[in-house]
Each structure stands twice: as structure tokens, then as C-alpha cells.
Amino acid sequence: VGGNLCTFNLLQGTEYMPDVKNKILFLEDDGESGKVFNRNFDRDLQSLLHLCKGKNIKAIIFGRAQKNCEMTEEKWIEIIKNKKELENIPIVINADFGHTTPICTIPIGGYAKIKFDENIDIEITK
């Protein structure tokens, strides 16, 4: 399950909010907030984690932020480490999907497998 994090927040409390339990989440953002992107992304992510209590999420893959957002690897790590709900969830950052180039299309509702070792392998299985 995945998509734009701001849109997920707009769906919270509606019948259209997808069930995130036992799912791999693919999350990205459009970067319209520019230099305050990391603060807004942090807040939007926390809102989503409060909704699902961070339980039973299999993994989260974050799409790479646009350059104007000035989102560094250090900022990603800081946001992730400050979320106790994410402590035991595998996380991938800077994946090539979302509002950036190059872009990978990810089928929503499909099945995927993630392997974490020397490399991170993401395989769409169905």
C-alpha cells in the first residue's frame, strides 16, 4: 500500500483510508513545502503512525525527496530514529519513486518481498 503521505493524512478517518496492517508501505511526498519539507514530512509521518500505532507494518519504503527539499540522509535518519513506532520496522530511504526522476512505478495492491543484506532487494512478486 502506498502513495503520497499528505494524501494519506487527508484520508485518515474516512472510508477511503487504506488498511496498512501487515503491509509494506511505499510513502513519498511532493516536496511543495520546500525547505520545511523535513518538518512537514516528520509531522505527517507521525500522524500516520498514531493512526495505526505503528503496529503490524511489515516495512516502509520512502521515496526520494526532491532536491529543493534539502532532505539529507542525516535528516531521514533523525526523523526515523525519533519515531519509537519504527524501532523494529525495516526502513528503506531514497527509493526511486514519487515526484522525482528517475522514477519506478509500484503497483498498489500487489505483493512484494524485501531482502535486507549487503544490498536491499525489492521484488514485486505478484
State each model region's role.
Residues 64-126:
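ATP/nucleoside-binding phosphotransfer catalytic cores, i.e., glycine-rich phosphate-binding loops
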Residues 17-19, 53, 84, 105-106:
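Solvent-exposed alpha-helices and their adjacent loops that cap or buttress functional pockets
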Residues 1-46:
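ATP/pyrophosphate-binding catalytic subdomain of soluble kinases
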Residues 48-58:
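Phosphate/pyrophosphate-binding loops at sites that engage ATP/ADP/AMP, CoA/4′-phosphopantetheine
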Residues 37, 50, 69-73:
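Short amphipathic alpha-helix initiation/capping segments at coil-to-helix junctions
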Residues 26-30, 61-66:
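Glycine-rich anion-binding loop/nest that anchors nucleotide
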Residues 23-25, 58-61, 89-92:
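Structural motif
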Residues 43, 55, 75-79:
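Short amphipathic alpha-helical segments
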